[in-house]
């Protein structure tokens, strides 16, 4: 499937319903443990505008303040290992993102943009930690730039040829950087 192709509507609906079951378990865990969360991105738009999923949306994005985020991951790791696996940089060396995914064990879902990922991907929900930012505008920009840089470098490290939603010279430059970062990372591991 290319980045411009869509799921077969029946397959997409089946995926959405399976993700909804994962989300219902998440809600129950949060309620039982007094943890707060919020929906954002396409997920929030879907709830407001469509009273469910956006018809073409294939994921559930959840934000949590850092303390609650860390607590819920710990709960999943300690109490729900029979049903779920936490995918993040702490548990999977090759996980390419700084957020976490809670995946249902025994399922498989690999979106096109992750076709080259070397990490188990299942039917999941995506959790994003929200951290405090400095009051000072200059420090805030520095923090934002740092987070952007390191998160993109992590992605480049794991995807030699990531799916790029750009064209022309920008695509060529970013592709060359991806190959260079991936190669450098590979060489570093070979010499260990």
Show where each model-derived region lies.
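Helical scaffold of the NTase/Pol beta-like nucleotidyltransferase catalytic core
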Residues: 1-40
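Metal-dependent nucleotidyltransferase catalytic core
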Residues: 22, 63-103
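Active-site nucleotide-donor binding segment shared across nucleotidyl transfer reactions
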Residues: 27-60, 69
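Short catalytic/ligand-binding loop motif for oxyanion handling, primarily in non-cytosolic enzymes
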Residues: 46-49, 71-73, 134-139
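Internal, conserved structured core segments that host functional sites
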Residues: 88-138
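Conserved, surface-exposed functional patches that form binding/active-site neighborhoods
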Residues: 119-172
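Low-complexity, serine/threonine/proline-enriched polar segments
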Residues: 174-182
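Conserved small/polar residues in nucleotide/adenosyl-binding loops
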Residues: 184-191
């Amino acid at each position: 499937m290319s980045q411009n192709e869509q799921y077969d509507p029946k397959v997409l609906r089946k995926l959405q319903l399976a993700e909804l079951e994962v989300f219902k378990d998440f809600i129950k865990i949060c309620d039982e443990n007094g943890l707060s969360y919020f929906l954002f991105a396409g997920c929030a738009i879907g709830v407001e505008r469509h009273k469910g999923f956006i018809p073409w949306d294939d994921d559930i994005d959840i934000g949590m303040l850092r303390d609650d985020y860390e607590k819920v991951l710990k709960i999943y790791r300690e109490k729900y290992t029979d049903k779920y696996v936490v995918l993040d940089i702490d548990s999977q060396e090759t996980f390419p993102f700084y957020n976490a995914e809670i995946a249902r064990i025994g399922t498989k879902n690999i979106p096109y943009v992750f076709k080259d990922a070397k990490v188990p991907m299942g039917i999941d929900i995506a959790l994003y930690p929200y951290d405090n930012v400095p009051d000072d505008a200059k420090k805030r920009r520095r923090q934002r730039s740092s987070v952007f840089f390191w998160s993109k470098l992590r992605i480049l490290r794991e995807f030699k040829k990531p799916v790029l939603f750009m064209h022309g010279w920008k695509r060529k430059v970013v592709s060359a950087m991806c190959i260079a970062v991936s190669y450098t990372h590979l060489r570093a591991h070979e010499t260990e």
